[in-house]
Protein backbone atom coordinates (compact mmCIF):
# COMPACT_ATOMS: atom_id res chain seq x y z
CA UNK A 1 0.00 0.00 0.00
CA UNK A 2 1.11 3.52 -0.68
CA UNK A 3 1.83 5.85 2.20
CA UNK A 4 -0.63 8.71 2.03
CA UNK A 5 0.95 12.13 2.57
CA UNK A 6 0.07 14.15 5.66
CA UNK A 7 -2.36 17.04 5.46
CA UNK A 8 -2.05 20.33 7.37
CA UNK A 9 -4.17 18.83 10.15
CA UNK A 10 -1.34 16.40 10.84
CA UNK A 11 1.48 18.97 10.42
CA UNK A 12 2.95 20.98 13.34
CA UNK A 13 1.94 24.62 13.23
CA UNK A 14 5.54 25.73 13.77
CA UNK A 15 6.54 23.92 10.57
CA UNK A 16 3.80 25.70 8.60
CA UNK A 17 4.79 29.04 10.14
CA UNK A 18 8.48 28.55 9.28
CA UNK A 19 7.68 27.71 5.66
CA UNK A 20 5.36 30.73 5.34
CA UNK A 21 7.98 33.02 6.89
CA UNK A 22 10.71 31.85 4.50
CA UNK A 23 8.47 32.26 1.46
CA UNK A 24 7.36 35.73 2.53
CA UNK A 25 10.93 36.80 3.29
CA UNK A 26 12.17 35.70 -0.13
CA UNK A 27 9.23 37.38 -1.88
CA UNK A 28 9.74 40.67 -0.04
CA UNK A 29 13.47 40.65 -0.81
CA UNK A 30 12.74 40.14 -4.51
CA UNK A 31 10.20 42.97 -4.41
CA UNK A 32 12.67 45.36 -2.76
CA UNK A 33 15.38 44.36 -5.23
CA UNK A 34 13.16 45.12 -8.21
CA UNK A 35 12.13 48.41 -6.62
CA UNK A 36 15.80 49.34 -6.10
CA UNK A 37 16.67 48.52 -9.71
CA UNK A 38 13.72 50.59 -10.96
CA UNK A 39 14.74 53.55 -8.79
CA UNK A 40 18.32 53.32 -10.08
CA UNK A 41 17.12 53.30 -13.71
CA UNK A 42 15.03 56.42 -13.10
CA UNK A 43 17.94 58.13 -11.35
CA UNK A 44 20.18 57.41 -14.34
CA UNK A 45 17.39 58.51 -16.74
CA UNK A 46 17.21 55.03 -18.30
CA UNK A 47 13.59 55.25 -19.30
CA UNK A 48 13.72 52.36 -21.78
CA UNK A 49 15.40 50.05 -19.26
CA UNK A 50 12.80 51.07 -16.70
CA UNK A 51 10.12 49.98 -19.17
CA UNK A 52 11.99 46.71 -19.68
CA UNK A 53 11.91 46.17 -15.93
CA UNK A 54 8.16 46.67 -16.01
CA UNK A 55 8.01 43.99 -18.71
CA UNK A 56 9.91 41.64 -16.39
CA UNK A 57 7.44 42.39 -13.62
CA UNK A 58 4.60 41.63 -16.01
CA UNK A 59 6.22 38.29 -16.86
CA UNK A 60 6.54 37.49 -13.16
CA UNK A 61 2.88 38.34 -12.68
CA UNK A 62 2.00 36.04 -15.57
CA UNK A 63 4.02 33.30 -13.92
CA UNK A 64 2.06 33.91 -10.76
CA UNK A 65 -1.21 33.41 -12.61
CA UNK A 66 0.12 30.25 -14.26
CA UNK A 67 1.23 28.93 -10.88
CA UNK A 68 -2.16 29.68 -9.39
CA UNK A 69 -3.97 27.93 -12.23
CA UNK A 70 -1.72 24.88 -12.04
CA UNK A 71 -2.28 24.57 -8.30
CA UNK A 72 -6.04 25.02 -8.56
CA UNK A 73 -6.47 22.74 -11.57
CA UNK A 74 -3.99 20.09 -10.47
CA UNK A 75 -6.64 17.74 -9.11
CA UNK A 76 -9.28 18.25 -11.85
CA UNK A 77 -6.74 17.75 -14.65
CA UNK A 78 -5.29 14.64 -13.03
CA UNK A 79 -8.80 13.16 -12.94
CA UNK A 80 -9.26 13.49 -16.71
CA UNK A 81 -8.94 9.95 -18.06
CA UNK A 82 -7.92 8.83 -21.55
CA UNK A 83 -7.75 5.33 -23.12
CA UNK A 84 -4.55 3.38 -22.58
CA UNK A 85 -3.79 2.98 -26.29
CA UNK A 86 -3.78 6.77 -26.73
CA UNK A 87 -1.70 7.26 -23.58
CA UNK A 88 0.91 4.83 -24.93
CA UNK A 89 1.86 7.15 -27.83
CA UNK A 90 4.35 10.03 -28.13
CA UNK A 91 6.41 9.15 -25.05
CA UNK A 92 9.84 10.72 -24.47
CA UNK A 93 11.20 7.25 -23.61
CA UNK A 94 11.12 4.15 -25.76
CA UNK A 95 9.39 0.98 -24.49
CA UNK A 96 12.76 -0.58 -23.77
CA UNK A 97 13.85 2.41 -21.68
CA UNK A 98 10.59 2.47 -19.73
CA UNK A 99 10.80 -1.26 -18.95
CA UNK A 100 14.41 -0.91 -17.82
CA UNK A 101 13.61 2.06 -15.61
CA UNK A 102 10.13 1.37 -14.22
CA UNK A 103 9.56 -2.35 -14.75
CA UNK A 104 7.24 -4.38 -16.96
CA UNK A 105 4.19 -3.66 -14.80
CA UNK A 106 4.38 -0.04 -15.84
CA UNK A 107 4.11 -0.96 -19.52
CA UNK A 108 1.41 -3.57 -19.02
CA UNK A 109 -0.84 -1.38 -16.88
CA UNK A 110 -0.08 1.90 -18.65
CA UNK A 111 0.42 3.56 -15.29
CA UNK A 112 2.78 3.72 -12.33
CA UNK A 113 1.61 1.45 -9.50
CA UNK A 114 2.01 3.19 -6.19
CA UNK A 115 4.26 1.09 -4.04
CA UNK A 116 5.93 1.44 -0.73
CA UNK A 117 9.22 3.26 -1.05
CA UNK A 118 11.96 0.84 -2.01
CA UNK A 119 15.45 1.83 -0.95
CA UNK A 120 16.80 0.03 -4.00
CA UNK A 121 14.85 2.42 -6.24
CA UNK A 122 16.57 5.54 -4.96
CA UNK A 123 17.85 6.44 -8.41
CA UNK A 124 14.36 6.96 -9.76
CA UNK A 125 13.28 10.59 -9.54
CA UNK A 126 9.59 9.68 -9.67
CA UNK A 127 7.88 10.32 -6.34
CA UNK A 128 5.21 8.27 -4.70
CA UNK A 129 2.75 11.09 -5.02
CA UNK A 130 -0.98 10.84 -5.57
CA UNK A 131 -3.72 13.35 -5.15
CA UNK A 132 -5.82 11.27 -2.79
CA UNK A 133 -3.66 8.21 -2.36
CA UNK A 134 -4.91 6.26 -5.39
CA UNK A 135 -5.45 6.54 -9.14
CA UNK A 136 -9.13 7.07 -10.01
CA UNK A 137 -8.54 6.43 -13.71
CA UNK A 138 -7.09 2.98 -12.95
CA UNK A 139 -10.49 1.91 -11.60
CA UNK A 140 -11.97 2.71 -15.02
CA UNK A 141 -9.24 0.89 -16.93
CA UNK A 142 -7.86 4.18 -18.24
CA UNK A 143 -4.87 6.48 -17.65
CA UNK A 144 -4.79 10.05 -16.32
CA UNK A 145 -4.20 12.74 -18.95
CA UNK A 146 -1.46 14.26 -16.78
CA UNK A 147 -0.76 13.07 -13.26
CA UNK A 148 -0.73 15.46 -10.32
CA UNK A 149 3.01 15.15 -10.02
CA UNK A 150 3.41 15.68 -13.77
CA UNK A 151 1.57 18.99 -13.43
CA UNK A 152 3.91 19.91 -10.59
CA UNK A 153 6.93 19.18 -12.80
CA UNK A 154 5.42 21.23 -15.63
CA UNK A 155 4.93 24.07 -13.18
CA UNK A 156 8.63 24.05 -12.34
CA UNK A 157 9.65 23.92 -16.01
CA UNK A 158 7.58 26.97 -16.99
CA UNK A 159 9.13 28.94 -14.16
CA UNK A 160 12.68 27.87 -15.11
CA UNK A 161 12.02 28.75 -18.76
CA UNK A 162 10.84 32.29 -17.99
CA UNK A 163 13.76 32.93 -15.63
CA UNK A 164 16.29 31.64 -18.16
CA UNK A 165 14.82 33.80 -20.91
CA UNK A 166 15.05 36.98 -18.84
CA UNK A 167 18.58 36.18 -17.65
CA UNK A 168 19.67 35.28 -21.16
CA UNK A 169 18.38 38.58 -22.57
CA UNK A 170 20.09 40.57 -19.82
CA UNK A 171 23.42 38.81 -20.37
CA UNK A 172 23.17 39.30 -24.14
CA UNK A 173 22.35 42.99 -23.75
CA UNK A 174 25.16 43.56 -21.24
CA UNK A 175 27.78 41.80 -23.36
CA UNK A 176 26.59 43.58 -26.49
CA UNK A 177 26.90 47.00 -24.86
CA UNK A 178 30.38 46.07 -23.66
CA UNK A 179 31.37 45.33 -27.25
CA UNK A 180 29.84 48.64 -28.39
CA UNK A 181 31.84 50.75 -25.93
CA UNK A 182 34.55 51.27 -28.54
CA UNK A 183 32.04 53.24 -30.59
CA UNK A 184 32.37 56.11 -28.12
CA UNK A 185 35.94 56.73 -29.25
CA UNK A 186 34.81 56.63 -32.88
CA UNK A 187 32.10 59.16 -32.09
CA UNK A 188 34.59 61.48 -30.38
CA UNK A 189 36.82 61.27 -33.43
CA UNK A 190 34.10 62.85 -35.57
CA UNK A 191 34.48 66.05 -33.55
CA UNK A 192 38.20 66.42 -34.36
CA UNK A 193 39.75 68.64 -37.01
CA UNK A 194 41.54 65.66 -38.53
CA UNK A 195 38.23 63.96 -39.25
CA UNK A 196 36.78 67.13 -40.77
CA UNK A 197 39.82 67.47 -43.01
CA UNK A 198 39.73 63.82 -44.11
CA UNK A 199 36.05 64.24 -45.05
CA UNK A 200 36.33 67.61 -46.76
CA UNK A 201 33.00 68.14 -48.58
CA UNK A 202 34.83 69.83 -51.49
CA UNK A 203 37.12 66.88 -52.09
CA UNK A 204 36.51 64.60 -55.09
CA UNK A 205 37.46 60.93 -55.02
CA UNK A 206 36.66 57.73 -56.81
CA UNK A 207 34.10 55.66 -54.92
CA UNK A 208 36.39 52.64 -55.02
CA UNK A 209 39.27 54.65 -53.53
CA UNK A 210 37.39 55.52 -50.34
CA UNK A 211 37.85 53.33 -47.27
CA UNK A 212 34.22 52.24 -47.48
CA UNK A 213 34.58 51.48 -51.19
CA UNK A 214 37.73 49.42 -50.73
CA UNK A 215 35.89 47.28 -48.18
CA UNK A 216 32.64 46.71 -50.07
CA UNK A 217 33.27 47.42 -53.78
CA UNK A 218 35.33 44.45 -54.91
CA UNK A 219 35.16 41.81 -57.58
CA UNK A 220 32.97 39.55 -55.44
CA UNK A 221 30.37 42.30 -55.05
CA UNK A 222 29.38 41.91 -58.72
CA UNK A 223 27.59 38.61 -58.07
CA UNK A 224 24.77 38.19 -55.56
CA UNK A 225 25.88 34.66 -54.71
CA UNK A 226 29.51 35.57 -54.02
CA UNK A 227 28.38 38.66 -52.12
CA UNK A 228 26.22 36.53 -49.80
CA UNK A 229 29.13 34.15 -49.20
CA UNK A 230 31.44 37.08 -48.45
CA UNK A 231 28.94 38.69 -46.08
CA UNK A 232 28.38 35.37 -44.31
CA UNK A 233 32.05 35.01 -43.40
CA UNK A 234 32.60 38.74 -42.87
CA UNK A 235 30.42 38.73 -39.77
CA UNK A 236 33.01 36.57 -37.97
CA UNK A 237 35.91 38.95 -38.68
CA UNK A 238 35.08 42.43 -37.46
CA UNK A 239 31.30 42.54 -37.72
CA UNK A 240 31.26 46.33 -37.20
CA UNK A 241 34.33 48.19 -38.40
CA UNK A 242 35.23 51.81 -37.88
CA UNK A 243 34.77 52.72 -41.54
CA UNK A 244 31.29 51.14 -41.60
CA UNK A 245 30.25 52.99 -38.46
CA UNK A 246 31.46 56.38 -39.70
CA UNK A 247 29.95 55.94 -43.17
CA UNK A 248 26.55 54.83 -41.89
CA UNK A 249 26.63 57.65 -39.36
CA UNK A 250 27.27 60.18 -42.11
CA UNK A 251 24.50 58.72 -44.26
CA UNK A 252 22.02 58.82 -41.39
CA UNK A 253 22.78 62.48 -40.65
CA UNK A 254 22.53 63.48 -44.31
CA UNK A 255 19.19 61.69 -44.66
CA UNK A 256 17.44 62.83 -41.49
CA UNK A 257 19.15 65.89 -39.97
CA UNK A 258 19.91 69.43 -41.18
CA UNK A 259 23.15 70.21 -42.96
CA UNK A 260 25.99 71.03 -40.61
CA UNK A 261 24.80 68.88 -37.71
CA UNK A 262 27.46 66.18 -38.16
CA UNK A 263 29.78 67.69 -35.57
CA UNK A 264 27.05 68.03 -32.97
CA UNK A 265 24.93 64.92 -33.32
CA UNK A 266 25.88 62.00 -31.05
CA UNK A 267 25.05 58.96 -33.16
CA UNK A 268 26.37 56.54 -30.55
CA UNK A 269 23.98 57.89 -27.90
CA UNK A 270 21.11 57.60 -30.34
CA UNK A 271 21.96 53.96 -31.06
CA UNK A 272 22.24 53.26 -27.34
CA UNK A 273 18.78 54.68 -26.64
CA UNK A 274 17.33 52.76 -29.58
CA UNK A 275 18.86 49.52 -28.33
CA UNK A 276 17.44 50.12 -24.86
CA UNK A 277 14.01 50.57 -26.42
CA UNK A 278 14.40 47.32 -28.38
CA UNK A 279 15.40 45.56 -25.17
CA UNK A 280 11.93 46.23 -23.78
CA UNK A 281 10.57 44.12 -26.65
CA UNK A 282 13.11 41.31 -26.44
CA UNK A 283 12.82 40.79 -22.69
CA UNK A 284 9.10 40.09 -22.94
CA UNK A 285 7.48 36.81 -23.98
CA UNK A 286 4.68 37.35 -26.47
CA UNK A 287 1.78 34.90 -27.01
CA UNK A 288 3.43 33.78 -30.26
CA UNK A 289 6.63 32.94 -28.40
CA UNK A 290 4.66 30.94 -25.83
CA UNK A 291 3.03 28.98 -28.68
CA UNK A 292 6.47 28.22 -30.09
CA UNK A 293 7.49 26.95 -26.65
CA UNK A 294 4.55 24.54 -26.72
CA UNK A 295 5.70 23.25 -30.13
CA UNK A 296 9.20 22.73 -28.76
CA UNK A 297 7.79 20.66 -25.92
CA UNK A 298 6.00 18.55 -28.52
CA UNK A 299 9.28 17.75 -30.29
CA UNK A 300 10.71 15.94 -27.25
CA UNK A 301 9.19 12.68 -28.43
CA UNK A 302 11.07 9.43 -28.84
CA UNK A 303 12.03 8.86 -32.46
CA UNK A 304 12.12 12.51 -33.45
CA UNK A 305 15.78 12.88 -32.40
CA UNK A 306 15.21 16.56 -31.68
CA UNK A 307 18.63 16.83 -30.06
CA UNK A 308 20.17 16.44 -33.54
CA UNK A 309 18.36 19.40 -35.14
CA UNK A 310 16.52 21.56 -32.60
CA UNK A 311 19.67 23.12 -31.02
CA UNK A 312 20.91 24.07 -34.50
CA UNK A 313 17.80 26.04 -35.51
CA UNK A 314 18.68 29.20 -33.54
CA UNK A 315 22.28 28.94 -34.77
CA UNK A 316 21.16 28.85 -38.40
CA UNK A 317 18.75 31.76 -37.92
CA UNK A 318 21.30 33.99 -36.17
CA UNK A 319 23.92 33.31 -38.85
CA UNK A 320 21.46 34.19 -41.62
CA UNK A 321 20.49 37.38 -39.78
CA UNK A 322 24.15 38.36 -39.41
CA UNK A 323 24.80 37.73 -43.10
CA UNK A 324 21.72 39.78 -44.04
CA UNK A 325 22.89 42.73 -41.95
CA UNK A 326 26.30 42.61 -43.62
CA UNK A 327 24.52 42.35 -46.97
CA UNK A 328 22.64 45.57 -46.24
CA UNK A 329 25.90 47.44 -45.63
CA UNK A 330 27.34 46.11 -48.89
CA UNK A 331 24.21 47.11 -50.81
CA UNK A 332 24.50 50.62 -49.42
CA UNK A 333 28.00 50.73 -50.90
CA UNK A 334 26.79 49.42 -54.25
CA UNK A 335 24.15 52.15 -54.37
CA UNK A 336 26.90 54.74 -54.06
CA UNK A 337 28.66 53.27 -57.07
CA UNK A 338 25.44 53.15 -59.08
CA UNK A 339 25.11 56.93 -58.75
CA UNK A 340 28.58 57.48 -60.20
CA UNK A 341 32.21 56.50 -59.91
CA UNK A 342 33.19 59.85 -58.37
CA UNK A 343 31.99 61.04 -54.96
CA UNK A 344 32.26 64.48 -53.45
CA UNK A 345 33.33 64.52 -49.83
CA UNK A 346 32.52 61.49 -47.68
CA UNK A 347 30.48 58.70 -49.31
CA UNK A 348 26.78 59.22 -48.64
CA UNK A 349 24.69 56.07 -48.23
CA UNK A 350 20.94 56.22 -48.80
CA UNK A 351 18.88 54.47 -46.09
CA UNK A 352 15.69 52.69 -47.06
CA UNK A 353 13.28 50.06 -45.77
CA UNK A 354 13.57 48.17 -49.06
CA UNK A 355 16.96 46.90 -47.90
CA UNK A 356 15.32 44.80 -45.18
CA UNK A 357 13.20 41.66 -45.41
CA UNK A 358 9.59 42.50 -46.31
CA UNK A 359 10.51 46.18 -46.00
CA UNK A 360 10.36 45.85 -42.21
CA UNK A 361 13.52 46.54 -40.17
CA UNK A 362 11.66 45.39 -37.05
CA UNK A 363 11.35 41.87 -38.48
CA UNK A 364 15.03 41.34 -37.73
CA UNK A 365 14.35 42.22 -34.10
CA UNK A 366 11.67 39.52 -34.02
CA UNK A 367 14.15 36.95 -35.34
CA UNK A 368 16.71 37.93 -32.70
CA UNK A 369 13.99 37.69 -30.06
CA UNK A 370 13.06 34.24 -31.36
CA UNK A 371 16.69 33.08 -31.30
CA UNK A 372 17.21 34.27 -27.73
CA UNK A 373 14.07 32.52 -26.57
CA UNK A 374 14.85 29.29 -28.45
CA UNK A 375 18.32 29.14 -26.99
CA UNK A 376 17.02 29.93 -23.52
CA UNK A 377 14.48 27.13 -23.99
CA UNK A 378 17.26 24.65 -24.81
CA UNK A 379 19.29 25.49 -21.72
CA UNK A 380 16.24 25.74 -19.44
CA UNK A 381 14.97 22.37 -20.61
CA UNK A 382 18.39 20.82 -20.08
CA UNK A 383 18.70 22.20 -16.53
CA UNK A 384 15.12 21.24 -15.62
CA UNK A 385 15.33 17.69 -17.00
CA UNK A 386 18.68 17.14 -15.28
CA UNK A 387 17.21 18.33 -11.99
CA UNK A 388 14.08 16.19 -12.31
CA UNK A 389 15.43 13.03 -13.97
CA UNK A 390 19.25 13.07 -13.43
CA UNK A 391 21.79 13.87 -16.15
CA UNK A 392 21.12 10.93 -18.44
CA UNK A 393 17.40 10.50 -19.03
CA UNK A 394 14.92 9.98 -21.84
CA UNK A 395 15.25 13.59 -23.00
CA UNK A 396 19.02 13.41 -23.46
CA UNK A 397 20.23 9.89 -22.82
CA UNK A 398 23.30 10.14 -25.06
CA UNK A 399 26.52 11.92 -24.26
CA UNK A 400 26.58 13.66 -27.66
CA UNK A 401 23.11 15.07 -26.96
CA UNK A 402 24.37 16.69 -23.77
CA UNK A 403 27.47 18.02 -25.52
CA UNK A 404 25.44 19.48 -28.41
CA UNK A 405 22.98 21.30 -26.14
CA UNK A 406 25.66 22.88 -23.96
CA UNK A 407 27.97 23.77 -26.86
CA UNK A 408 25.20 25.33 -28.94
CA UNK A 409 23.93 27.30 -25.96
CA UNK A 410 27.32 28.90 -25.32
CA UNK A 411 28.11 29.43 -29.02
CA UNK A 412 24.81 31.14 -29.79
CA UNK A 413 25.23 33.35 -26.73
CA UNK A 414 28.61 34.56 -27.98
CA UNK A 415 27.43 35.06 -31.57
CA UNK A 416 24.32 36.97 -30.56
CA UNK A 417 26.10 39.17 -28.00
CA UNK A 418 29.36 40.02 -29.74
CA UNK A 419 28.42 39.81 -33.43
CA UNK A 420 24.74 40.09 -34.26
CA UNK A 421 23.49 42.50 -31.59
CA UNK A 422 26.04 45.31 -32.26
CA UNK A 423 25.57 44.81 -36.00
CA UNK A 424 21.80 44.99 -35.64
CA UNK A 425 21.99 48.12 -33.47
CA UNK A 426 23.90 49.94 -36.22
CA UNK A 427 22.31 48.63 -39.43
CA UNK A 428 18.70 48.87 -38.25
CA UNK A 429 19.12 52.68 -38.25
CA UNK A 430 19.36 52.53 -42.05
CA UNK A 431 15.60 52.37 -42.47
CA UNK A 432 13.53 55.01 -44.21
CA UNK A 433 12.42 56.68 -40.98
CA UNK A 434 14.36 57.33 -37.83
CA UNK A 435 13.36 56.27 -34.36
CA UNK A 436 11.63 58.46 -31.76
CA UNK A 437 14.76 58.08 -29.64
CA UNK A 438 16.37 60.74 -31.85
CA UNK A 439 15.24 63.14 -29.14
CA UNK A 440 16.76 63.06 -25.70
CA UNK A 441 14.51 62.81 -22.66
CA UNK A 442 14.22 66.57 -22.19
CA UNK A 443 13.09 67.24 -25.76
CA UNK A 444 10.86 64.16 -25.87
CA UNK A 445 9.03 65.27 -22.73
CA UNK A 446 8.66 68.76 -24.22
CA UNK A 447 7.12 67.34 -27.39
CA UNK A 448 4.71 65.23 -25.37
CA UNK A 449 3.59 68.25 -23.34
CA UNK A 450 3.28 70.31 -26.49
CA UNK A 451 1.20 67.63 -28.19
CA UNK A 452 -1.00 67.25 -25.11
CA UNK A 453 -1.62 71.01 -24.99
CA UNK A 454 -2.36 71.19 -28.71
CA UNK A 455 -4.74 68.26 -28.51
CA UNK A 456 -6.50 69.79 -25.52
CA UNK A 457 -6.95 73.15 -27.25
CA UNK A 458 -8.15 71.52 -30.45
CA UNK A 459 -10.69 69.55 -28.44
CA UNK A 460 -12.04 72.67 -26.73
CA UNK A 461 -11.96 74.63 -30.00
CA UNK A 462 -10.03 77.68 -28.81
CA UNK A 463 -6.47 78.94 -28.87
CA UNK A 464 -4.38 81.08 -26.62
CA UNK A 465 -3.67 83.58 -29.38
CA UNK A 466 -5.85 86.51 -30.31
CA UNK A 467 -5.92 85.76 -34.01
CA UNK A 468 -9.28 85.19 -35.70
CA UNK A 469 -10.56 81.66 -35.86
CA UNK A 470 -10.24 81.52 -39.64
CA UNK A 471 -6.55 82.43 -39.59
CA UNK A 472 -5.69 80.46 -36.49
CA UNK A 473 -2.89 77.93 -37.18
CA UNK A 474 -3.58 74.25 -36.68
CA UNK A 475 -0.35 73.88 -34.72
CA UNK A 476 0.20 75.32 -31.23
CA UNK A 477 1.41 78.87 -30.88
CA UNK A 478 5.00 79.74 -30.01
CA UNK A 479 4.33 79.73 -26.33
CA UNK A 480 3.15 76.14 -26.56
CA UNK A 481 5.82 74.98 -29.00
CA UNK A 482 8.72 72.81 -27.77
CA UNK A 483 11.06 75.30 -29.40
CA UNK A 484 11.27 77.08 -26.06
CA UNK A 485 12.96 74.02 -24.56
CA UNK A 486 15.74 73.96 -27.13
CA UNK A 487 17.61 77.10 -26.08
CA UNK A 488 18.86 78.86 -22.98
CA UNK A 489 17.26 82.00 -21.76
CA UNK A 490 18.80 82.31 -18.30
CA UNK A 491 22.49 82.11 -19.15
CA UNK A 492 22.45 84.25 -22.27
CA UNK A 493 24.56 87.38 -22.16
CA UNK A 494 23.05 90.85 -22.22
CA UNK A 495 24.10 91.32 -25.82
CA UNK A 496 22.38 88.12 -26.83
CA UNK A 497 19.22 89.21 -25.05
CA UNK A 498 19.37 92.58 -26.80
CA UNK A 499 19.73 91.00 -30.21
CA UNK A 500 16.93 88.60 -29.39
CA UNK A 501 14.64 91.46 -28.39
CA UNK A 502 15.49 93.56 -31.40
CA UNK A 503 14.79 90.79 -33.83
CA UNK A 504 11.85 91.63 -36.10
CA UNK A 505 10.62 88.05 -36.02
CA UNK A 506 10.57 85.30 -33.44
CA UNK A 507 13.73 83.19 -33.17
CA UNK A 508 13.82 80.08 -35.33
CA UNK A 509 15.24 76.65 -34.59
CA UNK A 510 18.46 77.55 -36.35
CA UNK A 511 19.15 80.29 -33.83
CA UNK A 512 19.09 78.17 -30.69
CA UNK A 513 21.71 75.48 -30.76
CA UNK A 514 24.80 77.25 -31.94
CA UNK A 515 28.08 76.98 -30.15
CA UNK A 516 30.40 79.92 -30.40
CA UNK A 517 30.33 82.87 -32.77
CA UNK A 518 30.81 82.73 -36.48
CA UNK A 519 29.51 79.19 -36.83
CA UNK A 520 26.43 77.97 -38.62
CA UNK A 521 23.65 77.29 -36.15
CA UNK A 522 21.05 74.58 -36.56
CA UNK A 523 18.45 72.59 -34.72
CA UNK A 524 20.03 69.62 -32.99
CA UNK A 525 17.66 67.16 -31.30
CA UNK A 526 20.60 65.32 -29.77
CA UNK A 527 22.25 68.32 -28.15
CA UNK A 528 23.51 67.43 -24.69
CA UNK A 529 24.60 70.99 -23.86
CA UNK A 530 22.00 71.84 -21.26
CA UNK A 531 23.27 75.40 -20.92
CA UNK A 532 21.38 76.12 -24.13
CA UNK A 533 18.08 74.75 -22.88
CA UNK A 534 15.58 77.01 -21.11
CA UNK A 535 11.81 77.04 -20.89
CA UNK A 536 10.07 80.29 -21.80
CA UNK A 537 6.52 80.54 -20.58
CA UNK A 538 3.71 82.20 -22.48
CA UNK A 539 3.89 85.26 -20.26
CA UNK A 540 7.63 85.66 -20.81
CA UNK A 541 7.21 85.56 -24.54
CA UNK A 542 4.18 87.86 -24.61
CA UNK A 543 5.97 90.42 -22.40
CA UNK A 544 9.05 90.59 -24.62
CA UNK A 545 9.69 93.89 -26.43
CA UNK A 546 8.84 92.88 -29.97
CA UNK A 547 5.13 93.33 -30.51
CA UNK A 548 5.59 93.01 -34.26
CA UNK A 549 6.05 89.24 -33.92
CA UNK A 550 4.14 87.29 -36.56
CA UNK A 551 2.08 84.68 -34.73
CA UNK A 552 1.94 82.52 -37.86
CA UNK A 553 5.67 81.88 -37.64
CA UNK A 554 5.23 78.75 -35.47
CA UNK A 555 3.63 77.16 -38.50
CA UNK A 556 6.79 77.81 -40.48
CA UNK A 557 8.87 76.51 -37.58
CA UNK A 558 6.81 73.32 -37.49
CA UNK A 559 7.21 72.87 -41.25
CA UNK A 560 10.94 73.38 -40.90
CA UNK A 561 11.38 70.69 -38.28
CA UNK A 562 9.15 68.31 -40.25
CA UNK A 563 11.37 68.83 -43.29
CA UNK A 564 14.59 68.23 -41.38
CA UNK A 565 13.50 65.57 -38.90
CA UNK A 566 11.48 62.92 -40.70
CA UNK A 567 10.04 60.88 -37.86
CA UNK A 568 7.55 58.19 -38.81
CA UNK A 569 4.32 59.31 -37.16
CA UNK A 570 3.14 55.72 -36.88
CA UNK A 571 6.10 55.01 -34.61
CA UNK A 572 6.36 58.34 -32.82
CA UNK A 573 3.46 58.33 -30.43
CA UNK A 574 2.82 60.53 -27.45
CA UNK A 575 1.22 57.96 -25.21
CA UNK A 576 2.11 58.32 -21.57
UniProtKB/Swiss-Prot annotation:
Single GO molecular function: calmodulin binding
Basic residues bias (residue ranges): 450-462
Ranges per topology, Cytoplasmic: 35-59, 177-278, 330-362, 427-576
Membrane-spanning intervals of the chain: 14-34, 60-80, 156-176, 279-299, 309-329, 363-383, 406-426
Low complexity: compositionally biased ranges: 467-478
Biased composition regions of type Polar residues, renumbered to the chain: 488-503
Sequence segments annotated as region (Calmodulin-binding): 441-462
Gene Ontology biological process: defense response; defense response to fungus; leaf senescence
Region (Disordered) location: 450-557
Alphabetical keyword list: Calmodulin-binding, Membrane, Pathogenesis-related protein, Phosphoprotein, Plant defense, Transmembrane, Transmembrane helix
Main location: membrane
Record has Nucleotide-binding as a keyword: no
Extracellular domain ranges by topology: 1-13, 81-155, 300-308, 384-405
Subcellular location(s) per record: Membrane
Topology relative to the membrane: Multi-pass membrane protein
Positions bearing Phosphoserine: 505
The record's note on its domains: The C-terminus contains a calmodulin-binding domain, which binds calmodulin in a calcium-dependent fashion.
Protein role: May be involved in modulation of pathogen defense and leaf cell death. Activity seems to be regulated by Ca(2+)-dependent calmodulin binding and seems not to require heterotrimeric G proteins.
Recorded family membership: Belongs to the MLO family.
Protein name as it appears in the record: MLO-like protein 12
Lineage of source species: Eukaryota, Viridiplantae, Streptophyta, Embryophyta, Tracheophyta
Amino acid sequence: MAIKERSLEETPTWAVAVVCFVLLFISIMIEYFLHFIGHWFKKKHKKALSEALEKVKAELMLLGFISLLLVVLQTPVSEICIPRNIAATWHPCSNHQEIAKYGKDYIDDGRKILEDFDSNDFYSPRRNLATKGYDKCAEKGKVALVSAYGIHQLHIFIFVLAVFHVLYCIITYALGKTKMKKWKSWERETKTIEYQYANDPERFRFARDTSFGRRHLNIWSKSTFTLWITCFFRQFFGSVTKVDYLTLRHGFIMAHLPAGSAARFDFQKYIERSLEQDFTVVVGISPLIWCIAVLFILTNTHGWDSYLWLPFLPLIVILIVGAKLQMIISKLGLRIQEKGDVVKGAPVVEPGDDLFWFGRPRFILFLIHLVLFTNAFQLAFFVWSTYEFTLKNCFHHKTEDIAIRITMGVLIQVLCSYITLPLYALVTQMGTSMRPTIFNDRVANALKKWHHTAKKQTKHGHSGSNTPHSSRPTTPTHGMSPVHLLHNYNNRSLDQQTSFTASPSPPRFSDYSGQGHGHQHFFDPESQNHSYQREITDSEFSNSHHPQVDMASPVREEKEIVEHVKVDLSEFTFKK
